[in-house]
Amino acid sequence: MMKKFILALISMSLLLASGCAHIEEYDTEETADTEETTEVQTVTVDNPEYYTRFKNDGISINVYNWGEYIPDGSEEGVLNLNAEFTKLTGITVNYSTYATNEELYAKLKGGGSTYDIIIPSDYMISRMIKENMLEPLDKSNIPNFANIMDKFKSSEYDPSSKYSVPYTWGTVGIIYDTTVVDEEDIGWDILWDEDYSGRILMFDNPRDAFAIAENMLGYSLNTENSEELEKAAEKLKEQKKVVQAYVMDEIFDKMGAGEAIIAPYYAGDAVTLMDEYEDLGFVIPDSGTNLFIDAVCIPVSYTHLTLPTKA
């Protein structure tokens, strides 16, 4: 029974990704005697009956997700999506975040965790499947799976989407300070450029860091050749002398404050940064980049949860 509750959350998570849920914005007056207004967001769904069926069952579930993926209402006018989910379904979401796939993996592998929903990346999903860490999904309980684009339903890491439902995809490029760095000079090799020593940030996760080094060396970004991996590792060691820090979400503060001027990161996050800081730009080098998919999964440890009680 618990799995059905969890699958309901997966389906809700897919609403925004598939377009079945709508975030509406409207203006409300701050006071009766002023013309100042503020934008307020709310969520509506096409089939509310499906999502309200557990409303009075006193259910709570634990979600472990990337740090910047779901709005928490901390910005003015931006909704708290988990709170909206609870309002709609009656299901309480206990929400925590991680910065890397490796952090997620270590937490689950160490045991003692009771997460119901996780959102790892493609390569980590493949590893978790091989290590029997993920629960097979019953697609009949995930109606919004039908709204996922077909090209994302079949992949090397989970060929039939037996264990995962694609949530988002993106690419990696380079965020840079346009007042210091010329776009025409940007390739992956700029991350090794001694002219910018101490002002370069680098990924604090092996998958994306190795992909950049492999690209520079002309290797497949998915190589499993031990010699090529060793050479990529040496390339990354060479870079260390020019790197200010190895980061993930810390990039927002460091690039925003001007502490660093060059950093590889994800396209979606780059858009967020550029919206806030007009001097930042984003480039995908001509030599190419990697495409990633993050997907919703249920870890086998979900069965350790106590079954829900009536409210």
Q: For the regions a protein language model found, what residue spans apply to each?
A:
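Early extracytoplasmic/lumenal segment of secretory-pathway proteins
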Residues: 40-127
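Bacterial N-terminal signal peptides
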Residues: 9-17
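Positively charged n-region of N-terminal signal peptides that target proteins for export
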Residues: 1-5
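Bacterial lipoprotein signal-peptidase II cleavage site
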Residues: 21-28
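Periplasmic-binding protein-like
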Residues: 147, 229-238, 276-300
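Extracytoplasmic ligand-binding site segments that recognize negatively charged/polar headgroups
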Residues: 62-78, 99, 113-259
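A ligand-binding cleft/hinge motif common to bilobed small-molecule-binding domains
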Residues: 125-127, 262-279
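Conserved small/polar residues in nucleotide/adenosyl-binding loops
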Residues: 303-309
